[in-house]
């Protein structure tokens, strides 16, 4: 087993914990749908986060040629999956609260600041991550990557500071469309 394979185990576990929390949260919503008031914006953010967890796992493979690995680089690489895992925890009430009625709109707005600040932190971490893979790799991502980073960061910070429902409705859809397009254009292939 090489260094990349060894280190990717922990990265995969953290990402899998985030995916598990999202899928378990969806299951809890479905099982107790008569006691839960679903909020469609919250549902779109569930999809957005799950998509991001999958993309993070997908693009981690681009670290496969990194030599040598050191502890500090590995700690840095752990930041992105950790951010996404923590965001997955904020999307859903604690499992111990799942037996009580949940209004997901109330839950969403009670946690939106922390959720979006965490998600916004992903952007500069991803930029540094891309730079650490080398300047040629960073430049190969092209202007779409840079523009999307600006749009992600500004949109997420705005979502963190505003409770304006129309903005949250718009941005949930915009984020999903943007992520789908950027993923198709930049991260379509594994290598």
Spans of features found by a protein language model:
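Juxtamembrane boundary at the C-terminal end of a transmembrane helix
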Residues: 133, 182-191
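Hydrophobic transmembrane alpha-helical segments in integral membrane proteins
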Residues: 1-18, 187
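Membrane-proximal helix-loop-helix units in multi-pass membrane proteins
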Residues: 81-147
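A generic, lipid-embedded transmembrane alpha helix
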Residues: 40-63
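Central hydrophobic cores of alpha-helical transmembrane segments
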Residues: 44, 168-180
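Alpha-helical transmembrane segments of polytopic membrane proteins
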Residues: 12, 71-82, 141-152
